[in-house]
Amino acid sequence: MSCRSENLWLELIAGSRKTSNFLWALILFLGSFAFLLVGTSSYLGRNWISLFPSQQILFFPQGVVMSFYGIAGLFISSYLWCTISWNVGSGYDRFDRKEGIVCIFRWGFPGRNRRIFLRFLMKDIQSIRIEAREGFYARRILYMEIRGQGAIPLTRTAENWTPREIEQKAAELAYFLRVPMEVF
């Protein structure tokens, strides 16, 4: 989502609170909990899940392995839920022609560097660059070349932009910033 005026462009960046992340975290939690439950029921000799009689699953080695996978899955699931609750990767890109400043803000993981805030002068922007890689795993990323800083990605690598969409966004941004556009 973006908001534009004559001198200001504000681009809101979605973080990890996406439907797919919620679904994967839920599926992983339920599956790993079921694995842990089957492993525990094979150890105790009780039938906690009606689909798998505990007498058919021996604790060693099947129950141990299922318990291990259940615990590992719960750790990964908790990591995903924390990432979703912290909304890692969300933020905004703000381009202000009136003040001549570009601000890039992202939320990170908790700690000393939770808030990632970059500020540049517009006169230091050399170009807007599109990096396109075609093939089996095609990816198109939009970069902003900053003098003395290198390239800063403006789009996420997981976003699947069509060539037309990424080119249009790059052209609009380059026109707004009054810088050249490069394609690699």
Curated annotation (Swiss-Prot):
It comes from the Eukaryota. It is found in: Plastid, Chloroplast thylakoid membrane. GO terms for cellular component: chloroplast thylakoid membrane; photosystem I. Its main location: plastid. The keyword Transmembrane helix applies. The chain crosses the membrane at residues 22-42, 57-77. Keywords: Chloroplast, Membrane, Photosynthesis, Plastid, Thylakoid, Transmembrane, Transmembrane helix. This is Photosystem I assembly protein Ycf4. It comes from Pelargonium hortorum (Common geranium).
